[in-house]
Amino acid sequence: FATVDCSEYPKPVCSPEYMPLCGSDSKTYNNKCDFCSAVVESNGTLTLGHFGKC
């Protein structure tokens, strides 16, 4: 079970780096920052599916 530490998020601006993560919602997030922002917005219901594209 893969996890991502989102404790330092949300950040005001995400970098444009591309290191895709697949969320439990089957959506591909561009990077950890984008993913963690979505996790915060979901009140913790969103989890990491796996690293890489969905």
Swiss-Prot record:
Sequence intervals crossing the membrane: none
Superkingdom classification of source: Eukaryota
Keywords: Disulfide bond, Glycoprotein, Protease inhibitor, Repeat, Secreted, Serine protease inhibitor
Gene Ontology cellular component list: extracellular region
MF terms (GO), sorted A to Z: serine-type endopeptidase inhibitor activity
InterPro entries: Bifunctional_prot_inhibitor, Kazal_dom, Kazal_dom_sf, Prot_inh_Kazal-m
Chief localization: secreted
Site entry (Reactive bond 3), positions: P16, E17
Annotated disulfide bonds: C6-C36, C14-C33, C22-C54
SUPFAM superfamilies attached to this UniProt entry: Kazal-type serine protease inhibitors (SSF100895)
Glycosylation sites: N43
Domain Kazal-like: start-end pairs: 4-54
Localization (cell): Secreted
Domains: entry comment: Avian ovomucoid consists of three homologous, tandem Kazal family inhibitory domains.
Protein name listed in UniProt: Ovomucoid
